[in-house]
Design a protein with these regions (language model features):
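Conserved GNAT acetyl-CoA-binding A-motif
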Residues: 117, 124-144
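Conserved acetyl-CoA-binding loop-helix of GNAT-fold acetyltransferases
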Residues: 103, 109-125
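Short Pro/Gly-enriched beta-strand edge/turn motifs at strand-loop
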Residues: 40-46
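Conserved N-terminal entry element of GNAT/NAT acetyltransferase domains
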Residues: 1-38
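Conserved acyl-donor/pantetheine-binding loop and adjacent beta-alpha core of acyl/acetyltransferases
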Residues: 38, 50-57, 63-100
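Short coil/turn motifs at secondary-structure junctions
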Residues: 77-79, 106, 140, 177
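C-terminal "cap" of GNAT-fold acetyltransferases
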Residues: 146, 164-205, 210-212
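Conserved acetyl-CoA-binding loop of GNAT-fold acetyltransferases
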Residues: 149-163
Length: 212
């Protein structure tokens, strides 16, 4: 079973599972959401287009056997007015916000969420100028709520940055992701037999031996 992540684009936006292609609870404030009711999919596409054009990568999609089964959405806080509803807002100025994510139920508990977060971190490291990722997590997640569970965020490397009884603000330093990448590269090299196979020349002590 092949699985891989790719960047969120207008071409794969409509393929997102769970109706996420028409959810704008993070992208618009409550007043604007009421004004565009019935046209959420168009607004979501417009939002993705704007962020891609003005800032860069804003999401990752995970595919299993070429079928999209999950995604994460992220952007600087200025593009996510929906964060203003949280008591722990706003996000730090040096951070990008991981707004939400979704994995189809039949594919959960298989590490796809972690794969998505790692793909996001890779995009942000390449983008540059971002020190961390922050997210508003739910301590007691409710069905249909587009807020990532705190337990998931803790499991993929986030720490509590600003406590709250219901929706704390979590943070992951991108240096953590860089360290993870370095560890993976070492592991891969070991598997390929690169590490440990380079032998230093054995010095010939006879050539440098001095008479007693």
């Amino acid at each position: 079973m092949g699985r891989q992540t790719t960047r969120l684009t207008l071409d794969n936006l409509e393929q997102l599972p769970g109706g996420c292609d028409a959810c704008v609870c993070w992208e618009l404030d409550p007043v604007r959401r009421a004004q565009v009711r019935g046209h959420e999919a168009e607004e979501k596409a417009g939002w993705v287009s704007t962020v891609l054009r003005q800032w860069g990568s804003c999401g990752r999609v995970v595919c299993v056997d070429d079928e999209p089964v999950g995604h994460v959405l992220f952007a600087p806080g200025v593009f996510l007015p929906g964060t203003e509803r949280f008591a722990t807002a706003p996000a730090s100025q040096d951070a990008v916000v991981l707004a939400t994510g979704y994995v189809a139920p039949e594919h959960r508990l298989g590490g796809l969420g972690r794969l998505l977060v790692q793909g996001m971190a890779k995009d942000l490291i390449r983008h540059g100028g971002v020190n961390a990722v922050e997210a508003f997590g739910a301590i007691h997640p409710r069905p249909g709520e587009c807020i990532l569970p705190v337990d998931f965020l803790l499991a993929v490397g986030f720490k509590t940055h600003r406590p709250h009884p219901s929706y704390p603000r979590m943070r992951m330093d991108l240096r953590t992701a860089i360290t993870w990448r370095e560890e993976v590269e070492v592991a891969v090299n070991k598997l390929l037999g690169v590490v440990g196979k380079r032998r230093e020349p054995v010095p010939d002590h006879r050539a440098t031996r001095r008479p007693l």
